[in-house]
């Protein structure tokens, strides 16, 4: 074998190794949505206040708790009290599958998530479509407590850039005390800021036609959540929040977040 052929073989082998052992970033990334993929606020004729409620200071937050029960194989029930409005003292969080529920079943965890009441079931005896007193439900929102906090109670700032009609109009930071934080927690904090500063959701509608929040991880993978309700005259909070049931977490030090909004007259 001559020298040039030998070098070519070495390069080919090296390339094959890269293909086999390098993670395929593109395959795991969620492409940016096309305009047709996004929900449009003008096509929602219900009360936007029901969406606003999910992100306007109404969320479950607890530290160092353990599950005390379950209803189905893929959920966990916690003794968490609503210290603000006294609406509940039990919280059920539903996860994507049984394996994910088992992962956190006997762990000391922190819980942070948006919650709902209608169609929240803790047993087969609960009435369909009714509110179960003293109880609330959510999806995901779980992180292990041990070793997941910064020293001396320090907080991590996470930068969020907002683009309106493709132009960066504002940037702001939200804070978390967790090293590995759920995307849900950061989403809630981002939307809460935008509700207060940009009127993201009003009682009847929104000044924005479309919106999505995009997470960019350190390895280049991306994913996003649609920020507007589906078309129609009814908004199902439970169905909307189901997007968090995979309990997706990100590294708070490296994650980048973008919010993309289009105005109705843009």
From Swiss-Prot:
InterPro entries registered for this protein in UniProt: Enterotoxin (IPR008992), Staph/Strept_toxin_CS (IPR006126), Staph_tox_OB (IPR006173), SuperAg_toxin_C (IPR016091), Superantigen_bac (IPR013307), Toxin_b-grasp_Staph/Strep (IPR006123), Toxin_bac (IPR006177)
Domain of life assignment: Bacteria
UniProt xrefs under SUPFAM superfamilies: Bacterial enterotoxins, Superantigen toxins, C-terminal domain
- Protein's UniProt keywords contain Disulfide bond: yes
The record lists its disulfide bonds as 120-137
Instruction: Give GO terms: molecular function aspect only.
Output: metal ion binding; toxin activity
* GO terms for cellular component: extracellular region
UniProt keyword terms in alphabetical order: Disulfide bond, Enterotoxin, Metal-binding, Secreted, Signal, Superantigen, Toxin, Virulence, Zinc
User: How cofactor binds (record note)?
Assistant: Possesses two zinc-binding sites. The zinc ion is necessary for the toxin interaction with MHC class II.
Q: Where does Zn(2+) 2 bind?
A: 74, 98, 107, 146
Q: Which cofactor does it need?
A: Zn(2+)
Binding-site residues for Zn(2+) 1, renumbered to this chain: 36, 110, 145, 149
Cleavable signal peptide: 1-27
Query: What are the subcellular locations of this protein?
Result: Secreted
Effect of mutating residue 74 to A: About 30% loss of T-cell stimulation
Question: Key word Signal present in the record?
Answer: yes
Q: What does this protein do?
A: Staphylococcal enterotoxin that activates the host immune system by binding as unprocessed molecules to major histocompatibility (MHC) complex class II and T-cell receptor (TCR) molecules. In turn, this ternary complex activates a large number of T-lymphocytes initiating a systemic release of pro-inflammatory cytokines. Also causes the intoxication staphylococcal food poisoning syndrome.
Describe its assembly. Interacts with host MHC class II molecules composed of alpha/HLA-DRA and beta/HLA-DRB1 chains.
Provide the family line: Belongs to the staphylococcal/streptococcal toxin family.
- Record-given protein name: Enterotoxin type C-2
Q: What is the lineage of its organism?
A: Bacteria, Bacillati, Bacillota, Bacilli, Bacillales
